[in-house]
């Protein structure tokens, strides 16, 4: 049986936290900022946590990552 491998695209996009959660970056941060308020842009800079409904699936993709 072959070994399960880490999904490399996901490994580049998520970071594990000390308590076992996953940090992610916000979407909509590449361009077209003229339609967003300063408050929206400021909040988009901060990292967000992966929601509980997605956590199980993403953790399986990152099963070999420490």
Swiss-Prot record:
Pfam families: Ribosomal_L35p
Any GO BP: translation
Alphabetized SUPFAM superfamilies for the sequence: L35p-like
Protein name: Large ribosomal subunit protein bL35
Disordered: annotated span: 1-42
GO cellular component: cytosolic large ribosomal subunit
Family according to the record: Belongs to the bacterial ribosomal protein bL35 family.
Lineage, broadest ranks: Bacteria, Bacillati, Bacillota, Bacilli, Lactobacillales
Organism: Lactobacillus gasseri (strain ATCC 33323 / DSM 20243 / BCRC 14619 / CIP 102991 / JCM 1131 / KCTC 3163 / NCIMB 11718 / NCTC 13722 / AM63)
NCBIfam families: rpmI_bact (TIGR00001)
Keywords: Ribonucleoprotein, Ribosomal protein
GO molecular function: structural constituent of ribosome
PROSITE patterns the record matches: RIBOSOMAL_L35
InterPro entries, per database record: Ribosomal_bL35 (IPR001706), Ribosomal_bL35-like (IPR021137), Ribosomal_bL35_CS (IPR018265), Ribosomal_bL35_sf (IPR037229)
């Amino acid at each position: 049986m072959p070994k399960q491998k880490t999904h490399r695209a996901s490994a580049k996009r998520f970071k594990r936290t000390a308590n076992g959660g996953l940090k992610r970056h916000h979407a909509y941060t590449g361009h077209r900022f003229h339609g967003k308020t300063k408050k929206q842009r400021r909040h988009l800079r901060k990292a967000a946590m992966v929601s509980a409904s997605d956590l199980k699936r993403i953790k399986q993709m990152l099963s070999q990552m420490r």
